[in-house]
Each structure stands twice: as structure tokens, then as C-alpha cells.
UniProtKB/Swiss-Prot annotation:
Hydrolyzes the pyrophosphate bond of UDP-2,3-diacylglucosamine to yield 2,3-diacylglucosamine 1-phosphate (lipid X) and UMP by catalyzing the attack of water at the alpha-P atom. Involved in the biosynthesis of lipid A, a phosphorylated glycolipid that anchors the lipopolysaccharide to the outer membrane of the cell. Pathway: Glycolipid biosynthesis; lipid IV(A) biosynthesis; lipid IV(A) from (3R)-3-hydroxytetradecanoyl-[acyl-carrier-protein] and UDP-N-acetyl-alpha-D-glucosamine: step 4/6. This is UDP-2,3-diacylglucosamine hydrolase. It is found in: Cell inner membrane. The gene is lpxH. NCBIfam families: lipid_A_lpxH, PRK05340.1. It comes from the Bacteria. Its cofactor is Mn(2+). It catalyses: UDP-2-N,3-O-bis[(3R)-3-hydroxytetradecanoyl]-alpha-D-glucosamine + H2O = 2-N,3-O-bis[(3R)-3-hydroxytetradecanoyl]-alpha-D-glucosaminyl 1-phosphate + UMP + 2 H(+). Keywords: Cell inner membrane, Cell membrane, Hydrolase, Lipid A biosynthesis, Lipid biosynthesis, Lipid metabolism, Manganese, Membrane, Metal-binding. Coiled coil: none annotated. GO terms for molecular function: manganese ion binding; UDP-2,3-diacylglucosamine hydrolase activity. It comes from Coxiella burnetii (strain Dugway 5J108-111).
Length: 243
């Protein structure tokens, strides 16, 4: 049956070759069978600018380019790769999506988000997010030498890890009130997002109507994909390959 695939939170980096191998397997064996592929943020562990053309980044860009030649491929930036820009889109052939975006998925309106904006109890991250999403801040960051951007990215990742270790389970997750607010505002019955690394299908009720929130999984020890079929059925699928 015709279907569309959704992935997020691969956190690709040169230091995790097993995850890269799983992504390349996904491109070869799963993506070609889909109508379209949506990547909902944190595709990279860190992205410091489209001008950072390392051999590893070129490899990933070329793999996306091959995919996008034959399949519509959509890319939403996350909090780890928010500096991805139009040059990356031109090099890969992906279409950039704003966060949030409502798409028509087999004639059904579906809200797509990375998901970090839903974690409103994490006040420190929300303050950080408000800063980094300002166009002038991004322009300033991209004006810095690559060597300095690498150092800053490393520093930010270390700070993020320390911060996450201090948070309780609930603070790291989305808040139901924000989920309800956003879904009401966008007038949708289905929300798909990543970020929290807690793959699940949540049944909700909004304005007396049954709704769903699907959370994509992170690629820690293997692949994680949402397969959404034309008939409205869907499944979160995990896979692992022998390396």
C-alpha cells in the first residue's frame, strides 16, 4: 500500500558510524518504497553552517541528493541543526519546512513539529530557543569563522548534556496544555513530532473530538521510522541491522 515515512532525531555525526550505517540502509531499502519522506529535525547532532563541507557532511548531503532525485523529501530543522539553510536545500534537493507546518497527508491535515517548543516546562531551553531562532542571531553566528563555530557547538552540546541531567522526567517531556493549544490553533486531529526521544502513540481528546499525537523515536542503537499508509493506518517501526 502507498505510504509516507517520517523520521527524526538521528543526531548524525562522524563519531557514530553505526547510526550512519542504519540511515544509509534506510535510504536503500525503505525510502524508495515510500511516496515521500519527512525528516523532522535533529537530523545532525550539530550543524554549524552550510559552508562546513567536511567529508562526512558531503557523504550525507550526497545520500540525501540521491534520495531527493526520486522521492519528495522534506526537512524540518531541529534545535541541533537550526543553522541549516537554503544552500543545504539546494545541494540536497530537499524542501525545507517551517516549524510548525500543516501538511495534507492523503487528504488529511496533519501538524508536523520538531517538538522542542512543546516542552514549555523546560524554561532554560525555551529561553535558548527564543534566542537562536532570531534571524539576526543566526546571521551573526554564521558570520563567525568555522573554527570558532566548532568550538561554540561543542560548548553548547556539553552545556545541553549537563542541563538535561538536572531535569526531571516530566520537565523533559511536552506539556499537555501546549499540545492542546497548538492542535486547537492549527485545527488538526493528528500531530507528529520528535525531540523527546520517547516514541509512542498518544490518544487525546480535544474539544470533544478524538485526536492523536505520534512521537517519533531517536536513532540510538538502530533506526526508528513512522510508516503512515494511504488508508490512515500507521505504525512506529524500529529496525536494527548487522554491522
Amino acid at each position: 500500500m502507498r505510504h509516507t515515512l517520517f523520521i527524526s532525531d538521528l543526531h548524525l555525526e562522524e563519531e557514530t558510524p553505526s547510526i550512519t550505517a542504519h540511515f544509509l540502509y534506510f535510504l536503500k531499502h525503505q525510502a524508495p518504497k515510500a511516496d515521500a519522506i519527512y525528516i523532522l529535525g535533529d537530523f545532525f547532532e550539530a550543524w554549524i553552517g552550510d559552508d562546513n563541507q567536511t567529508p562526512f557532511n558531503r557523504k550525507i548531503i550526497e545520500s540525501l541528493q540521491t534520495l531527493a532525485r526520486t522521492k519528495p523529501t522534506y526537512f524540518m530543522r531541529g534545535n541541533r541543526d537550526f543553522l541549516i539553510g537554503q544552500r543545504f536545500a539546494a545541494m540536497t534537493g530537499v524542501s525545507l519546512l517551517e516549524d510548525p507546518s500543516v501538511i495534507q497527508l492523503y487528504n488529511k491535515p496533519v501538524l508536523l513539529m520538531h517538538g522542542d517548543s512543546l516542552c514549555t516546562l523546560d524554561h532554560k531551553h525555551q529561553a535558548y530557543r527564543r534566542k537562536i531562532m532570531k534571524p539576526w542571531v543566526q546571521k551573526l553566528m554564521l558570520s563567525l569563522p568555522l573554527s570558532l563555530r566548532r568550538k561554540l557547538a561543542k560548548k553548547f552540546r556539553e552545556q545541553s548534556r549537563r542541563h538535561n541531567r538536572t531535569l526531571s522526567y516530566g520537565i523533559k517531556d511536552v506539556t499537555p496544555e501546549e499540545v492542546n493549544r497548538v492542535m486547537k490553533e492549527q485545527n488538526v486531529e493528528l500531530l507528529i513530532h520528535g525531540h523527546t526521544h520517547r516514541p509512542a502513540i498518544h490518544d487525546l481528546t480535544i474539544n470533544g473530538n478524538p485526536t492523536k499525537r505520534i512521537v517519533l523515536g531517536a536513532w540510538h542503537h538502530g533506526g526508528s521510522v513512522l510508516r503512515y499508509a494511504q488508508d490512515g493506518s500507521f505504525e512506529l517501526q524500529a529496525f536494527k541491522i548487522d554491522l
